[in-house]
Amino acid sequence: MGHFTEEDKATITSLWGKVNVEDAGGETLGRLLVVYPWTQRFFDSFGNLSSASAIMGNPKVKAHGKKVLTSLGGAIKNLDDLKGTFAQLSELHCDKLHVDPENFRLLGNVLVTVLAIHFGKEFTPEVQASWQKMVAGVASALSSRYH
């Protein structure tokens, strides 16, 4: 999972303060569902997921994406205890929803892509390195309840 340096924490927190959680969340989850279509099976109740435009415009996708990134915002405040922060969500996704833990890694990588698109030149290789470490840590924490 890796240890977060003070520089990592500052880099992650600084960029996070500029993220529009609603826009980035909807785009991140939407892209996950388009790029990795097998993930759609966890979102049967979301209605029309028949095409990229249907997915990207789907209000339930946008709302859940916002919820996901809001949860991530809580983790950013607790980078030294990601496992504790995500204990309940890990249990839910493992025991009740049966989500493949690999999907957490995929979602993290899609988020990094979205941040790169949104922030352009500001999303330097150093910023990306800190964010990759963070999304890997979150994916690991969310996978911690799996047997």
Swiss-Prot record:
A single Pfam family it belongs to is Globin
- What superkingdom heads the lineage? Eukaryota
SUPFAM superfamilies xrefs? Globin-like
Q: GO terms for molecular function, please?
A: haptoglobin binding; heme binding; hemoglobin alpha binding; metal ion binding; organic acid binding; oxygen binding; oxygen carrier activity; peroxidase activity
Sites of S-nitrosocysteine modification: C94
Q: Which residues carry this modification: Phosphothreonine?
A: T13
> Domain Globin spans what residues?
3-147
Any idea which UniProt keywords this protein has? Acetylation, Heme, Iron, Metal-binding, Oxygen transport, Phosphoprotein, S-nitrosylation, Transport
Q: Which GO terms describe its biological process?
A: hydrogen peroxide catabolic process
Q: Which residues carry this modification: N6-acetyllysine?
A: K60, K83
| Tissue expression notes | Red blood cells.
GO CC annotations on file: blood microparticle; haptoglobin-hemoglobin complex; hemoglobin complex
Q: Which residues cross the membrane?
A: none
Binding locations of heme b: H64, H93
Q: Which residues carry this modification: Phosphoserine?
A: S45, S51, S53, S140
Question: Does this entry carry the keyword Phosphoprotein?
Answer: yes
Q: Which residues carry this modification: N-acetylglycine?
A: G2
Question: Which InterPro entries does the annotation name?
Answer: Globin, Globin-like_sf, Globin/Proto, Hemoglobin_b, Hemoglobin_oxygen_transport
**What family name appears in the similarity comment?**
Belongs to the globin family.
Q: Record's PANTHER family?
A: HEMOGLOBIN FAMILY MEMBER, HEMOGLOBIN SUBUNIT GAMMA-1
**Main role?**
Gamma chains make up the fetal hemoglobin F, in combination with alpha chains.
According to the record's subunit comment, the protein's assembly and interactions are:
Heterotetramer of two alpha chains and two gamma chains in fetal hemoglobin (Hb F).
Quote the protein name from its UniProt record.
Answer: Hemoglobin subunit gamma-1
